[in-house]
């Protein structure tokens, strides 16, 4: 076999760089153990900052499943029917907030009639008496404890009764009535005297008319 002649390096040839690995003579570059050339390492230069984490297959699968399970954002379409909860679940879940007035009034009626639960707090004495005694045997309300009201005390006077003051107004009314009757009689007498004078004048005129 013919040997290939090695061409000696020219005088103007480029001197091998210090960064490029080579053998002891510096003529032949050494092969990289990792199989990556120098150009590849130069292109994969490390940038600034912390390198991003490598995403594993399990995390990607979990993210995909989470996206699939979550509710789609935005307004739902019109033709898609919304999921209606079953009656058993809706009845089991208690609504939050204050109950409606209709339910409150119904509860009050049941407690007032005695069919529902017992009232809260200490019951009144009248209610206790009404509950113990049947409705047919109730004759009068239960007697209350304590001092009687002022109205009942005033109805039973303790001191000597005062003289009746109704006699004085009656006497004043009688005197006023007498004065009015006397004035009326006086006016009637005056009117009768005037009428008498008018009658006598008319008689005189008639006599004069007959004499002519």
From Swiss-Prot:
Main location: nucleus
Protein origin, superkingdom: Eukaryota
Metal-binding keyword on record: no
InterPro entries: AT_hook_DNA-bd_motif
One of the record's GO molecular function terms: DNA binding
Sections of the chain in a coiled coil: 176-210
Function: May bind DNA.
The protein's name: Putative DNA-binding protein At1g48610
UniProt organism field: Arabidopsis thaliana (Mouse-ear cress)
